[in-house]
C-alpha cells in the first residue's frame, strides 16, 4: 500500500513478545495482509512445526509502517531457509512500499547471522534488490464469490463438473463439521492417507492441532462420512470474509463416490452460512492436477508472485515435489504401509515448511 509522506527513513528491528498487540493492530489496517501474516498462524507454526518465528518490524517515529514475518526453517534433508511464512502459501512484506528495501536488507542480514543461505517470500511487496529472483509463472491462486444459496451454488459449478458432483450427492453421505477430538481424528486419518497416496510425507499431527487451537472459531474441519466411515476431510481457515480449505484430501474409496466433490460443495454452503462471501481455493502449481481440478470448478487462475534470495555461492533449497530428483522417492513413498508413513513422515515434512 502507499503510505502518507513521512520524514526520515524507516528503522527495522526484530519484534519481541511485547510487540504482539501492536503488530496485530497494524495488520488490521492492511488490506493485503493474509491469514498467514496473522500472529496466530505464526505462533501455531512455531509451536506445531518447531520453526522459530522472527518478525521484522519497520517503524517511523515509533509507529509500525511495514512488517515481514519469517520462520527459520532447518532440516537435515532440505537445509536452512528463512521463509515467509512457514507451511503457508502466502506471506511476504506487508505495509508501506517505501519500507520494503529496509526489510529486505534486514532479512538478508538475519539470514547471514542464522547461517541460512536462502530467504523465501511467498507474496507481498516484491524485493527490487540485487540477488533476488522473482517467479510469476509457477503458481496460481483461485478465488471465487460464493453464490446466494445452495441451489445457486450448484448451478455455479460448470456443467461437466456439476454432473460429477450430482453423482456424489446421490449417495447417503453424512456431513460433519467441528474442531473437537473426533473431527481432528477423522481429519488426520483421511489426510495422512491422502498425502501418502500422493507420495508426500504428512505434516506433524501437532501442527494441525496448534492451528485449530490458535484460530478457535476461525478454523474448523468438515468431514464427509459414508456408512460411518470418513472418506474426505478438510481443515479450513476463515479470514476477512473468505473460507480457505487449506489441508484437505480423501481416502482411496472417496474417488469412486465423488466424496471430494461433495466435500468442497458442502464447504461452500457451510461457509456461506457462517457469513463468508468468498471461496479461496488456495494455490496450485501451474498445469498440475490440482490446478486443472480447480479450473474444472469454474475458478479462474490468478498468477502469484514469489521471490527468493540465495547467498553467494549457495544453491537454493529444492522442496518442489515435481522436481525430477524426487520422483523415485515419491513412488517409493506411495508403497509404504500407512503406519510407517505416518511414523516417519512428520520428521521429514517439518523441513517442507
Residue ranges and their predicted role:
Residues 2-7, 72, 128-152, 276-353:
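Active-site/acyl-donor-binding loops of N-acyltransferases
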Residues 4-6, 83-87, 166-170:
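Short, flexible turn/loop "capping" segments at secondary-structure junctions
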Residues 8-61, 70-78, 123-139, 147-256:
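A conserved beta-strand-loop-helix scaffold within acyl/acetyltransferase catalytic domains
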Residues 51-53, 113-116, 274-276:
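Short, high-confidence coil segments that cap the C-terminus of an alpha-helix
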Residues 57-61, 65, 88, 101-110, ...:
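Aromatic (often tryptophan-rich) hydrophobic motifs at membrane interfaces
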Residues 72-90:
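Conserved acyl-donor/pantetheine-binding loop and adjacent beta-alpha core of acyl/acetyltransferases
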Residues 90-96:
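The substrate-binding groove and active-site-proximal loops of carbohydrate-active enzymes
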Residues 98-141:
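Non-catalytic accessory segments adjacent to catalytic cores
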Amino acid at each position: 500500500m502507499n503510505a502518507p509522506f513521512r520524514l526520515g527513513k524507516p528503522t527495522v528491528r526484530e519484534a519481541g513478545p511485547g510487540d504482539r498487540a501492536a503488530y496485530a493492530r497494524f495488520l488490521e489496517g492492511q488490506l493485503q495482509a493474509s491469514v498467514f501474516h496473522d500472529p496466530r498462524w505464526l505462533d501455531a507454526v512455531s509451536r506445531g512445526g518447531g520453526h522459530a518465528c522472527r518478525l521484522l518490524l519497520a517503524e517511523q517515529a515509533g509507529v509500525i509502517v511495514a512488517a515481514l514475518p519469517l520462520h527459520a526453517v532447518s532440516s537435515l534433508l532440505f537445509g536452512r531457509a528463512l521463509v515467509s511464512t512457514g507451511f503457508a502459501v502466502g506471506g511476504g512484506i506487508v505495509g508501506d512500499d517505501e519500507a520494503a528495501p529496509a526489510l529486505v536488507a534486514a532479512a538478508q542480514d538475519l539470514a547471514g547471522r542464522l547461517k541460512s543461505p536462502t530467504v523465501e517470500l511467498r507474496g507481498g511487496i516484491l524485493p527490487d534488490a540485487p540477488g533476488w529472483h522473482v517467479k510469476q509463472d509457477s503458481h496460481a491462486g483461485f478465488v471465487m464469490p460464493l453464490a446466494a444459496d445452495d441451489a445457486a451454488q450448484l448451478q455455479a459449478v460448470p456443467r461437466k463438473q456439476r454432473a460429477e458432483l450430482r453423482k456424489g450427492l446421490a449417495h447417503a453421505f453424512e456431513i460433519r463439521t467441528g474442531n473437537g477430538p473426533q473431527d481432528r481424528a477423522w481429519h488426520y486419518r483421511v489426510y495422512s492417507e491422502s498425502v501418502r497416496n500422493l507420495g508426500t510425507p504428512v505434516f506433524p499431527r501437532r501442527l494441525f492441532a496448534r492451528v485449530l487451537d490458535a484460530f478457535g472459531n476461525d478454523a474448523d474441519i468438515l468431514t464427509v462420512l459414508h456408512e460411518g466411515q470418513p472418506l474426505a476431510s478438510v481443515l479450513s481457515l476463515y479470514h476477512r470474509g473468505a473460507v480457505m480449505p487449506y489441508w484437505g484430501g480423501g481416502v482411496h474409496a472417496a474417488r469412486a463416490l465423488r466424496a471430494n466433490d461433495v466435500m468442497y460443495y458442502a464447504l461452500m454452503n457451510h461457509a456461506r452460512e457462517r457469513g463468508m462471501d468468498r471461496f479461496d481455493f488456495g494455490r496450485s502449481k501451474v498445469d498440475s492436477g490440482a490446478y486443472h481440478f480447480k479450473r474444472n470448478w469454474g475458478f479462474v487462475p490468478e498468477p502469484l508472485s514469489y521471490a527468493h534470495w540465495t547467498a553467494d555461492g549457495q544453491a537454493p533449497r529444492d522442496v518442489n515435489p515435481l522436481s525430477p530428483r524426487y520422483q523415485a522417492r515419491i513412488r517409493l513413498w506411495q508403497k509404504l504401509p500407512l503406519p510407517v508413513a505416518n511414523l516417519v513422515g512428520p520428521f521429514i515434512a517439518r523441513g517442507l515448511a
